[in-house]
Amino acid sequence: LLGDGRFDGRVDNLLSWRSEPLMPGELLPDTGPFPEVPPLGSRHESAIVCMRSHQGSGAVCIAHHRLHMSGHPRALMLDAHDLPHDASECRDAVHASLREAALACTPMIVDARRIAADRVAEVIALLDQSFIPVIVITGPSVSVDLPPDRIVDVPVAAPAVRDAWLDYLTNQISSPRTVDTLQRLEPEDIRERLLHGNEKISASAPSDMGTLARPVIPTF
């Protein structure tokens, strides 16, 4: 981001922009009270929000929507699963990612759903050294060293909500394909299946997916 529009080479394969919402806010489940996302550069006790998420919750879309509602139209997305396992290299990669976010004046969303609990703690500790607002998405049972008011538990979205995701994305993509096993799929997974068929599915999707019921009237 120093004039050439490219990320630091150490994190180029870890980072991506999240600018256009995949799902409108009215199609996302209500998470109840959500911690304040502080303004960029402000001094505060913690700039981190942890979302403990079940699969099929729409967590990434919820995180992006919450940032958008807080005045951040785009965010830098970091996939923690691809961070180096070496502690020193991991630290350098996280710091380089925070630097990219600072240079772009954007908050971050860190997807930590596919890493072990001890790695989650390590990544959060590294992120907490910065004043960049960060939403960290973890698995549902991960214990994190953050104040309770900085933690949000996000359940699996109701069948009617996931049904609305499918209808919305099908209309957006104009795809003749169908998705009949998306009980715990995220909107990103549904979109991938509509675009590429059932043979392509997110690596984070569980193997015990059921069939989505299609209620007549979605309720949120």
Task: Describe the residue ranges of each PLM region.
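AAA+ P-loop ATPase motor domain of ring mechanoenzymes
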Residues: 1-74, 80-83, 96, 133-220
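Conserved P-loop NTPase "ATPase switch" module shared by AAA+ and STAND
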Residues: 76-138
